[in-house]
Swiss-Prot record:
Residues annotated to bind NAD(+): 75-76, 149-150, 177, 179, 190-195, 214, 248
Top class in the EC scheme: transferase
Known EC number: 2.7.1.23
Classification of source organism: Bacteria, Pseudomonadati, Pseudomonadota, Betaproteobacteria, Burkholderiales
GO molecular function annotations of the record: ATP binding; metal ion binding; NAD binding; NAD+ kinase activity
Domain of life: Bacteria
Keywords for this protein: ATP-binding, Cytoplasm, Kinase, NAD, NADP, Nucleotide-binding, Transferase
Cofactors (names): a divalent metal cation
Name of the protein: NAD kinase
Source species of the chain: Paraburkholderia phytofirmans (strain DSM 17436 / LMG 22146 / PsJN) (Burkholderia phytofirmans)
Family the UniProt entry places it in: Belongs to the NAD kinase family.
Length: 300
């Protein structure tokens, strides 16, 4: 079949260590290939499920060769491959094979119908921002990473509170004693930040949210900053303080270290089915608009 879509090569990425994922991945590959698209697999995914019929590529090779990546997994899978493909601006399509699925929005039961439609051009596109962070020690950068959801400075499970000196654009904001601080993108506002009583930011809102984790002072509240802000967090006191990036990679910190966080120049293009609504996602995932029936109200 002749392909007339803007997409020619489609990469498939699967959630690692997931029993039963081989069947839907290979079925989707066959479905896409029959429509004339070239199909490639992410190398770790191919090795895990034993795929040999399609090329197996590393993320950098996918970025250079594929026109779109279809991700079958949970939000964590999407975050991981999204960070790696962001420099290549490879669009992502997410199929939910996890639990919550805020950014993998296509039900696995509908993938064979919806994904081919999207590859044929029937989709809605949006750009999701990333954060970039670097750790400064003694005035020198020692670590650098991207984050799709959030950069989290926090204490380990058995240590006391950490004291953090926080400034924005070089201006002192506050000293905070807490279990940590979350710096989140709008995408990340529905992740760890939400469970720490942070606000939900619409994905198209240009902002960065700071959310304290169990602060000592109840007056320490979340705050939304302009997305061109530079946030600096210095470790004043505390034992075993770490910084996590999307809760998928981390590094240990020392007293005096400073974490500098700002919006990355990279964005992640995400494709959704026609009719996609962020508010529908919130209703479904957070169980909004669900009220007990009158019968339930009348039960003793």
């Amino acid at each position: 079949m002749q392909v007339t879509s803007q997409f020619k090569t489609v990469a498939l990425v699967g959630r690692n260590n997931t029993p039963g994922i081989a069947e839907p991945l290979t079925a989707l590959a066959s479905c896409i290939a029959k429509r004339g698209f070239e199909v490639v697999f992410e190398a770790d995914t191919a090795a895990e499920i034993g795929v040999t019929d399609y090329p197996a590529l590393r993320p950098a090779e996918i970025g250079a060769r594929a026109d779109v990546a279809v991700v079958l997994g949970g939000d964590g899978t999407m975050l991981g491959i999204g960070r790696q493909l962001a420099p290549y601006r490879t669009p992502l399509i997410g199929i939910n094979h996890g639990r919550l699925g805020f950014i993998t929005d296509i039900p696995i039961s509908d993938m064979r119908e919806i994904v081919p439609q999207m590859l044929s051009g029937n989709f809605e596109r949006e750009e999701r921002v990333l954060l970039e962070a670097r750790i400064m020690r003694g005035g020198n950068p020692i670590y650098h990473a991207l984050a799709f959801n959030d950069v989290v400075v926090n204490r380990s499970g058995f240590s006391g509170m950490a004291e953090l000196h926080v400034s924005v654009d070089g201006r002192f904001m506050y000293n905070q004693r807490s279990d940590g601080l979350i710096v989140a993108t709008p995408t990340g506002s529905t992740a760890y930040a939400l469970s720490s009583q942070g606000p939900i930011l619409h994905p198209q809102l240009q902002g960065i949210v700071l959310v304290p984790i169990a602060p000592h002072a109840l007056s320490n509240r979340p705050i939304v900053l302009p997305d061109d802000s530079k946030v600096s967090i210095q470790i004043v006191s505390g034992r075993e303080v770490n910084v996590n990036f999307d809760m998928q990679s981390f590094t240990s910190l020392e007293l005096g270290d400073t974490i500098e966080v700002r919006r990355s120049r990279h964005t992640v293009p995400m494709l959704h089915p026609v009719g996609y609504s962020f508010f529908t996602t919130l209703r479904k995932k957070l169980h909004w608009n669900e009220y007990p029936s009158h019968e339930e109200d009348s039960k003793p």
